[in-house]
């Protein structure tokens, strides 16, 4: 379906990320979608990986249009989507908010730290269907972009049947080598490894975060398992973090006689 063939209002897509406005992944995604949609990029001016849902509260956001429909923001991924939906596009909201393509996986507990997922989550917060895309590597961005287009076109033909944020991870493989798309749940990792202690040139202690923990819950049905077997993982996420199954137990605990 080409944009010029549409007789109705053209599809509008907002794209953001956490790797920065100049990252390869975001432009692979935008280039793939421009033939079926009007694409507006609003992304951080630099890499903001791991920013999660943070907002900039104590300084202004500086925004520059660095190319037609491409905006660089001195802020976090959440800032970018918040600005786009509440200011830049407030009079003509996009039909979709897409985030990515991230340079690396966002599997299991990663979603709690991910700026990629957070950008999509902000779109969801503000009432727009949102999808986060991540490539489990840094080579085959065209594969992830093709998967993104496939899902967008499927959404146009039959809207996504859930009011949830979607988290999509794509194996770093050529398109023809990818397995099917599998609906998954989040897996889980072991705790991250220890901090790495070093000395700076002046002899002061400095610390680096250790590598992420190995997969702890990576069995069949998880996002880790799908990726390990060459399949695209798509996980519906909800913002409500309430442990609903624990409400009754907590209520009983509070009412126990001391």
Curated annotation (Swiss-Prot):
GO terms for molecular function: 3'-nucleotidase activity; 5'-nucleotidase activity; exopolyphosphatase activity; metal ion binding; nucleotide binding. It is found in: Cytoplasm. Its EC number is 3.1.3.5. InterPro entries: SurE, SurE-like_Pase/nucleotidase, SurE-like_sf. Keywords: Cytoplasm, Hydrolase, Metal-binding, Nucleotide-binding. Its main location: cytoplasm. Gene3D superfamilies: Survival protein SurE-like phosphatase/nucleotidase. A divalent metal cation binds at residues 18-19, 49, 102. The keyword Hydrolase applies. One of its GO terms (cellular component) is cytoplasm. Binds 1 divalent metal cation per subunit. Its cofactor is a divalent metal cation. It catalyses: a ribonucleoside 5'-phosphate + H2O = a ribonucleoside + phosphate. Belongs to the SurE nucleotidase family. Nucleotidase that shows phosphatase activity on nucleoside 5'-monophosphates. This is 5'-nucleotidase SurE. It comes from Vibrio parahaemolyticus serotype O3:K6 (strain RIMD 2210633).
